[in-house]
């Protein structure tokens, strides 16, 4: 769905190999504006959409779209929000500058995936995170969602990629995470 990078290839190949050996995987990714919904046959899943997620004291609507990868028996769930993911780029603008709201986009994506997994009533054995954009998952599972039984036995694996993130977040990043009552020490 995105340009070929090591991260994109691994995000597909690892779950494909697990499925090929009898496992059950689901892929979650942001529905970036450069993803062609018609060509990839994305459609909204009404029963999963419709909730608002609070990010930095603002209610943001969560839209869940899904597509299947032909011949692979794999579903991809797209976390969508017009304000965060409509732009026709992934993490940087046309001048190669990181978007100022990437921190809020990370929070929204993290909470969106977790809430969607809860609605699916699917208890994953392993969550495999790819890249810095997913780096808040362990923090949110350990704190904000610590009492969710669906994640009680879940293990987390993280893949970090070279030159995945070069930059700094806004000074307000910690405050935005703290809004979800996540202590500074975490």
Protein language model regions, located:
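Catalytic cores of nucleotide-sugar-dependent glycosyltransferases that transfer UDP/GDP/TDP-activated
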Residues: 1-186
């Amino acid at each position: 769905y995105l340009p070929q990078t090591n991260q994109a290839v691994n995000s597909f190949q690892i779950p494909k190999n697990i499925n090929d050996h009898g496992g059950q995987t689901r892929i979650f990714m942001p529905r970036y504006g450069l993803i062609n919904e018609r060509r990839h046959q994305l459609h909204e899943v009404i029963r999963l959409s419709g909730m608002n997620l609070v990010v930095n004291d603002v209610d943001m609507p969560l839209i869940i779209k899904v597509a299947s990868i032909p011949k692979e028996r794999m579903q991809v769930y797209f976390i969508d929000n017009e304000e965060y993911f409509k732009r026709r780029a992934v993490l940087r603008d046309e001048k190669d500058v990181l978007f100022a709201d990437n921190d809020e986009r990370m929070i929204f994506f993290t909470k969106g995936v977790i809430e969607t997994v809860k609605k699916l009533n699917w208890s994953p054995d392993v969550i495999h995170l790819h890249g810095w954009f997913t780096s808040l998952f362990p923090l949110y599972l350990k704190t904000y969602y610590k009492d969710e039984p669906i994640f009680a036995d879940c293990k987390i694996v993280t893949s970090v990629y070279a030159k995945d993130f070069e930059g700094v977040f806004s000074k307000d990043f910690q405050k935005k995470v703290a809004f979800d009552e996540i202590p500074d020490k975490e």
